[in-house]
Design a protein with these regions (language model features):
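Extended redox/cofactor-interaction regions of prokaryotic respiratory oxidoreductases
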Residues: 1, 107, 116-118, 122, ...
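Long, well-ordered, tryptophan-enriched scaffold segments
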Residues: 1-196
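A glycine-rich phosphate-binding loop feature that marks nucleotide/adenosyl-phosphate handling sites
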Residues: 188-189, 205-207, 237-248, 511-525, ...
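Short, well-ordered loop/turn and helix-capping segments at boundaries between secondary-structure elements
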Residues: 147, 191, 226-233, 400-404, ...
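Flexible glycine/proline-rich, aromatic-decorated loop/lid segments
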Residues: 445-477
Length: 874
């Protein structure tokens, strides 16, 4: 909150208006040294001027001992006393009106708030000094909330002012929560936090994540708990109880999962962007960024979300695979033919081809036959029956089969080639996939549509590890019986595939060089690649293309394809090297554990690349390796794992692992008794001496910085795109009005006077159990034998709907069929269609589409939000 930011003067309608700008950096003060563009500034009461405290992200890379939250100046080490608000400085302060975006009046609009400001001498890029208006984040936050500080602006007259943004009376019209109830809860929450030292908590489920504006909603909750001093306190803060897996032994799991014990980096893709393009949701995009931005920010980012994603991939913020319009093996071969001998020369040759346009990015033409996915393998996942939004898009574009898709192509992006179209002769000629393989324990919807189904071992037929965000223990899975018939464990299935692949690779591939492009990842030096939050596109000439800084990383990886099976079946040598194991920017060597695993698991005796290395014969061996390499399950590794963080912070921290140094969780040990995970630098909780995990204790109590730009939790985000969308502060943004932008209209969507237009919500599956899901007799009886659609009794009566009637729900994305469940408990204007209602049992024909009646995701499609694409910036 004390950090300083510029107020930018902007001309609007013939008037000069102040708008919150980017944060002030050490470089703005003319200071040099290590990463001054990444060190943030406060106003120090003692020196009566600006200062640069420890803990900013600039101190994390390139120096030692100042990446900590001691309130000292990182240049002269003097103690600091930060000014929270310039209003504290009395007569030395001016008051100005600044404009803030609000989003609850239909179109985004602006309101003014009074902020106290000071004039700061700033050194420009040309070396000349100029005066700029600055204020604190606290003052900006207060002004944005319409708090009347006696200096004018669009302020609230009191809690009962329903016209003013963020008052209790204002929210009542949106949420239905009476203003007096909201005031009571807020006061009790804050009072309890004050009395207990921060032990007030906000608990939420998965619902927030299903909304387009989930990020600002989360930020609002985090801001509330931070203002009340609840972070880093046992029993305080915020927590989401969803049932997601939290991989506590993270470093060991990552090593085995991505094969970093042998080589790297891996290719990892964010699922939302992948499906947005693979399912051609972008061709039917109805959202306009200009319509979502405040009036003063029109044109500050691409209007089409697909153009935003393409720019993010180009600048290295997000991955995009396939990478190029040619095989990445061919990229290295072409470089070699052009005379490139070393890996560095191959990268340089590739970079020149990218600059000239000779080598095209796949994201620039995602429907070109050279750029589409061809093979997909699913295991422990049911994308078509559960989690992938855009079920009918999946059927139409990826599989090329019949679907109930009812949409039309919308406006197209500017920077992405829309040709060839998928159905054209030059396109893929129908579905993009040549092969879809699913490994499953049951005949799920995904299996029904797959080319090959591999029967997998069931829950009680294999070895595995389990750890969740809801308890601190690491649990084992042990087989009660062998897999039935032809079923195999997932580990054994991939082992068999690796064996056959290696056999074929010896004939057809050999050892090849692969050009791997990877995004600028969080917790790596790439996160300080693009200073000031400015969007500088190398293709447009804004900057030189520099891998790892202004664009994605490029690295040549040698692939010994004939040895894949041997590498799969043994633990590679990298884990014994310095920094060979790690996660979240912290790494260490596991040389002692490497030798211990040889004794525990045995060594490979067969000649070849893996000879003499620890064996991985089965899933249990893989679990043993994960436990051995992770500080959360091996106390000796835990003590060692703090060394890198101790250098960065200048603090002694390994005392947090000393009490468990002689403890090593083994698979046999946790089978006898599941055990709590240990404290580690990969997580922010402290779990020594019987303490229960609470996030951010390491940051608040031991002064290890948060992994953010300033090293603190942020109320204000100053990236150009965050300001462009009006989301620098945790503002209220209403749900997207999908009806208003056209999701229930179009030439293929019939409308009648009896139609009900309802807001569709998809709560967690109601009639299912995780071991056998919903398609068994007991669960089917509970759910009336098929899909169900819950709706309000008054809504049902208005359309002549009786309980248990078959209903047809539809929009541009597709059709879902289900029985009406009429209940007064459902809010007016809403419908509940529980998730994971599969199209396997009792799915009738849809009169509208002529196909079977879909799943809950038949009514959805993938959406992408630009604020969640930002990278290279902390």
């Amino acid at each position: 909150l004390p950090f300083l930011l510029f107020l930018d003067e902007e001309e609007r309608d013939g008037e000069t208006v102040l708008a919150p700008g980017r944060c002030v950096r050490a470089s703005d003060l003319g200071l040099g040294g290590n990463n001054p563009e990444w060190k943030f500034v406060i106003h120090d009461r003692t020196r009566k001027g600006p200062a640069v405290p420890n803990g900013s992200i600039g101190s994390r890379y390139g120096e030692e001992g100042t990446w900590n939250l001691e309130m000292r100046d990182c240049y002269d080490r003097a103690d600091l006393d930060p000014v929270l608000s310039y209003a504290e400085l009395g007569d030395e302060t001016e008051w100005k009106l600044a404009a803030f975006p609000v989003f609850f009046e239909g179109q985004p609009s602006l309101r003014k708030g009074a902020v106290p400001v000071r004039r700061l001498a700033v050194t420009g890029a040309d070396g000349k000094q100029q005066e700029r208006l600055v204020t604190t984040v606290f003052d900006i936050l207060a002004a944005s909330l319409a708090i009347d500080r006696g200096h004018g602006g669009d302020v609230a007259s009191g809690y009962e002012d329903a016209r003013a943004y963020a008052t209790p009376a204002w929210q009542e019209a949106i949420t239905g929560v009476p203003a007096e109830d909201m005031i009571r809860v807020a006061r009790e929450f804050a009072d309890n936090a004050e009395r207990t030292g921060g032990r007030s908590m906000i608990i939420m489920g998965a619902g927030v994540n299903h909304w387009y504006n989930n990020d600002v909603t989360y930020r609002a909750m985090i801001s509330l708990t931070t203002l009340c001093g609840c972070q880093g306190v046992s029993g305080g803060g915020w927590a989401h109880y969803v049932g997601q897996e939290k991989v506590r032994p993270l470093a060991g799991w990552t090593t085995v999962t991505v094969g970093s014990d042998w080589m790297g980096p891996p290719r990892l893709h964010n699922g939302t962007s992948f499906y947005y393009f693979a399912l051609d949701s972008w061709r039917h995009e109805l959202l306009s960024m200009d319509k979502l931005t405040p009036p003063d920010r029109k044109g500050s980012l691409p209007d089409h979300p697909a153009d935003c994603n393409a720019l993010a991939a180009r600048l290295g913020w997000l991955p995009f695979y396939p990478q190029f319009k040619e095989n990445s093996l061919e990229t290295c071969e072409k470089a070699a033919k052009a005379g490139a001998a070393s890996n560095e020369e191959i990268v340089a040759h590739t970079l020149e081809r990218l600059k000239s346009g000779d080598l095209e990015l796949s994201v620039d033409a995602p429907d070109d036959p050279a750029n589409v996915p061809r093979v997909m393998v699913f295991w422990r996942a049911n994308p078509l029956g559960s989690n992938v939004k855009g079920h009918e898009y999946f059927l139409k574009y990826l599989l090329g089969t019949e679907s109930s898709f009812l949409g039309e192509e919308a406006r197209q992006p500017e920077t992405i080639r829309t040709t060839p179209e998928p159905d054209s002769p030059e396109g893929v000629g129908g579905g993009k996939l040549d092969l879809m393989v699913t490994s499953e324990i049951r005949m799920s919807t995904t299996c029904v549509y797959s080319d090959i189904v591999l029967p997998a071992a069931h829950w009680y037929e294999y070895h595995d590890l389990s750890s969740t965000d809801m308890h601190p223990f690491i649990h084992p899975f042990n087989p009660a019986t062998d897999p039935a018939w032809e079923a195999r464990t997932n580990w054994d299935q991939f082992k068999a595939i690796a064996q056959k692949f290696s056999e074929l690779a010896g004939k057809h591939l050999g050892v090849r060089k692969d050009m791997v492009a990877t995004a600028l990842l969080h917790d790596t030096p790439g996160e300080i690649g693009q200073p000031f939050g400015e969007v500088r596109d190398w293709r447009r000439g804004d900057a030189e293309p520099v891998p790892g800084k202004t664009m994605f990383n490029l690295k040549v990886v040698e692939r010994p394809y004939p040895d894949i099976y041997k590498m799969y079946s043994a633990l590679g040598p990298n884990v014994a090297k310095p920094g060979g194991v790690g996660a979240k920017g912290v790494s260490w060597s596991c040389a002692p554990e490497y030798e211990q695993l040889k004794a525990r698991l045995g060594v490979v005796s067969e000649p070849g690349v893996s000879e003499g290395m620890p064996r991985i014969d089965n899933a249990k061996d893989a679990c043993e390796i994960m436990l051995a390499l992770s500080p959360e399950s091996n106390g000796d590794v835990g003590v060692r794992s703090w060394a890198g963080l101790e250098k960065q912070t200048g603090f002694k921290l390994n005392d947090l692992s000393r009490p468990v140094q002689d403890q090593h969780l083994t698979f046999e040990g946790i089978t006898a008794r599941p055990t709590k995970g240990f404290t580690s630098p990969n997580w922010s909780g402290i779990e020594v001496h019987g303490r229960t995990y609470a996030p951010f204790e390491l940051n608040v109590q031991r002064l290890v910085p948060f992994h953010t730009l300033t090293g603190r939790q942020h109320f204000y985000m100053d990236h150009e795109w965050m300001r462009g969308l009006g989301e620098s502060l945790p503002v209220y943004r209403p749900p997207l009005s999908l009806a208003a932008i056209g999701e229930i209209s179009g030439p293929r969507i019939p409308r009648t006077d009896k139609d009900l237009v309802l807001n569709f919500l998809s709560p967690h599956s109601k009639w299912s159990i995780h071991s056998s899901y919903s398609d068994n007799h007991i669960m089917r009886e509970l759910s009336r034998g098929g899909g169900e659609i819950w709706l309000n009794n008054d809504d049902a009566a208005s359309a002549g709907i009786a309980d248990n009637d078959w209903l047809e729900c539809f929009n541009a994305n597709g059709v879902f069929m289900g029985r009406a469940v009429v209940s007064h408990r459902i809010p007016h204007g809403k419908t509940y269609i529980h998730h994971a209602q599969e199209r396997t049992v009792n799915v009738p024909l849809s009169p509208l589409s002529g196909t079977r009646g879909g799943t809950h995701n038949s009514l959805t499609r993938p959406l992408v939000k630009p604020t969640q694409m930002i990278g290279g910036y902390g």
